Regions:
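Sec-dependent signal peptide cleavage junction
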Residues: 8-47, 51-58, 327-331
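Outer-envelope beta-barrel architecture signal
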Residues: 33-39, 85-91, 136-142, 177-181, ...
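Residues that define the transmembrane beta-barrel architecture of outer-membrane proteins
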Residues: 67-73, 118-124, 159-165, 194-198, ...
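Transmembrane beta-strands of outer-membrane beta-barrel pores
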Residues: 43-49, 93-101, 146-152, 185-191, ...
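Residue-level signature of outer-membrane beta-barrel architecture
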Residues: 77-81, 128, 132, 173, ...
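Surface-exposed strand-loop-strand hairpins of Gram-negative outer-membrane beta-barrel proteins
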Residues: 46-72, 111-116, 306
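Outer-membrane beta-barrel translocator/channel fold
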Residues: 50-57, 107-108, 216-317
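Outer-membrane beta-barrel "beta-signal"
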Residues: 200-203, 271, 310-331
Length: 331
């Protein structure tokens, strides 16, 4: 799950609104950042690439083959539940579906192939977003999320072994209308395994066309504002997740459940275009580099792997639509 602690929950665009003074409450976003997304629907396809799997377990062994494609469907909804000048609270819901399609495996009975091929991996989650602003230049943002990640079937209530919890609190400083920075400590799955790590946020707008937005080590992006209705992002992102799956085949029969841990680095370009005020679409393309892709015993923290996989870089294409607050709501 990607670290997300960005921006105010109802971002404004005018300099008179987002400039922080000693007598006004700080707004974390900087000039040029787009309105926050209230609803997102995206489809992604990672194209064919080779994969090699190794295991120290003699019963599992090694294998290689081709991942014909990875299909991903993503739905997110976020809405405010409390708004005031100094404190904002929002609630978010998400659904994510990921499907791996293998072909040309050197051993069709290989444990990895049996456990992952054409098996829908789902993530259903809920997140709470808190933003506290003080008069002047300081603010606090926190995101708490819980997700149920795994290969559970629709209509079946998942057990607690599918539960994933992430938290990311941060303090920030709004230097002026063009610059905002801050930092915090996160607990999450950006590296595939559950990890506690520091992060740093830096947002800067240089002029009416160019800016940067970054949450290190999660992402760093260059923003090009062609107009108020078209924005181009390009940069690098670190994405990760963890799924609980039920193993298939005799080689892994000793394990009740396994944990698929994945983390990847992405180089991308993303174009966002307004269709009508609150209705936008986006198209994203890039290259995915696998950092971690492994099966391990389903424990909270377990550095040992059962199957370690190496994937070659692969191109990906993503398209979607999203809704933002109408401009009149921010006036």
């Amino acid at each position: 799950m990607l670290l997300c602690v960005s921006a105010d929950l109802a971002q404004a665009q005018g300099l008179d609104v987002i400039h922080c003074t000693d007598s006004t409450f700080c707004v974390p976003s900087v000039w040029g950042m787009p309105r926050s997304k209230a609803l997102i629907f995206e489809y992604e396809n990672v194209f064919s690439h080779r994969l090699r799997a190794t295991s120290d377990l003699e019963a599992v062994g090694n294998g290689s083959g081709e991942l014909q494609r990875e299909e991903r469907l993503d739905f997110k909804l976020r809405f405010p539940i409390y708004l005031s000048e100094s404190f904002k609270m929002a609630l978010g819901f998400s659904y994510f579906n990921e499907d791996y399609i293998f072909k040309d495996f050197d051993n069709p009975d290989y444990a990895l192939f049996q456990s992952l091929d054409d098996k829908n991996l789902k993530s259903m989650g809920m997140a709470l977003y808190l933003t506290k602003a003080w008069k002047g230049k300081h603010y606090f943002i926190m995101r708490i999320s819980t997700d149920l990640n795994g290969d559970y079937k629709a209509g079946v209530l998942p057990r607690d072994r599918y539960l994933r919890v992430s938290i990311a609190p941060m303090f920030g400083v709004k230097k002026d209308a063009w610059t905002s920075y801050g930092g915090g400590i996160a607990w999450g799955y950006n590296f595939g395994r559950p990890t506690i790590y520091p992060f740093f946020v830096y947002n800067r707008t240089f002029n009416d066309k160019l800016g940067i937005e970054s949450i290190l080590p999660a992402n760093a992006m260059l923003r090009v504002n062609f107009s108020q209705s078209m924005i181009l992002y390009s940069g690098v992102a670190l994405e990760g997740s963890s799924y609980t799956i039920r193993p298939s085949g005799e080689a892994l029969a000793q394990f009740e459940t396994l944990q698929l841990r994945k983390s990847e680095i992405r180089l991308f370009a993303n174009l966002e275009r307004e269709i009508h005020d609150w209705f936008w679409f986006n198209v994203e393309a890039g290259v995915r580099f696998s950092y971690r892709f492994e099966l391990a015993e389903n424990l909270l923290y377990n550095p040992e792997t059962i199957i370690d996989m190496r994937r070659r870089p692969a191109p990906f294409l993503k398209a979607g639509v999203f809704l933002v607050p109408p401009k009149k709501f921010l006036e």
